Amino acid sequence: MVQQIWETLKETITAYTGLSPAAFFTVLALAFAVYQVVSGFFVSPEVHRPRSLEVQPQSEPLPPPVQLGEITEEELKLYDGSDSKKPLLMAIKGQIYDVSQSRMFYGPGGPYALFAGKDASRALAKMSFEDQDLTGDISGLGAFELEALQDWEYKFMSKYVKVGTIQKKDGEGKESSEPSEAKTASAEGLSTNTGEEASAITHDETSRSTGEKIAETTEKKDVATDDDDAAKE
């Protein structure tokens, strides 16, 4: 049965193509190979991508921001992105923000990596990357620079979570308290001096009034004595 089918197939191939069965199947195989090569230029690579590559591992979600409270500038430096297990932090005007979601910008190798782990208020206001500007000291800045810094602060407040503040140095607290104490002492001294002056003035006026009264009484007595003497004469 199979032999009959094969003989019939060979006769049909020879009758319709003029080729031997071996030549016919060779041409058919070459045509299929050419089709596969040509179709590869027009079909999207995703069609030929292995299924194992289609399932890409999802990136791990970022942990929720952790509130740190008040920390020093030295402690803030530990969150500059060098340790991938720690959040990436940055401060503006003493307020610390978690910028881990923008690690591509503020993390190692990013365009703003120098600002991470620091209060970069002055650098942001001046758009400077100089080491001396990587500080939270904004004294001496112009109106335009302060406005630019304000824009940065609004951006951070709307995009990132605030996780703490930078602890003020002891010197700053003393400097701020000493002028107040000096003002208080000055005010107390002024009040005391004013009270003493007022008391002295009142005492002088009282003394003058008493002296004037005594003088008037003496004059009256002298006049009365003179009148008596005149009457006797």
From Swiss-Prot:
GO terms for MF: protein domain specific binding; steroid binding
Modified residues (Phosphothreonine): T225
Pfam families: Cyt-b5 (PF00173)
Keyword Membrane assigned: yes
Record organism: Arabidopsis thaliana (Mouse-ear cress)
Domain statement: The cytochrome b5 heme-binding domain lacks the conserved iron-binding His residues at positions 105 and 129.
Membership in a protein family: Belongs to the cytochrome b5 family. MAPR subfamily.
Transmembrane spans: 23-43
Tree of life domain: Eukaryota
Positions of region (Disordered): 169-233
Cellular location(s): Cell membrane
Region (Steroid-binding): 70-167
Gene: MSBP2
Annotated Cytochrome b5 heme-binding domain residues: 70-167
Protein name stated in the entry: Membrane steroid-binding protein 2
GO cellular component, one term: cytosol
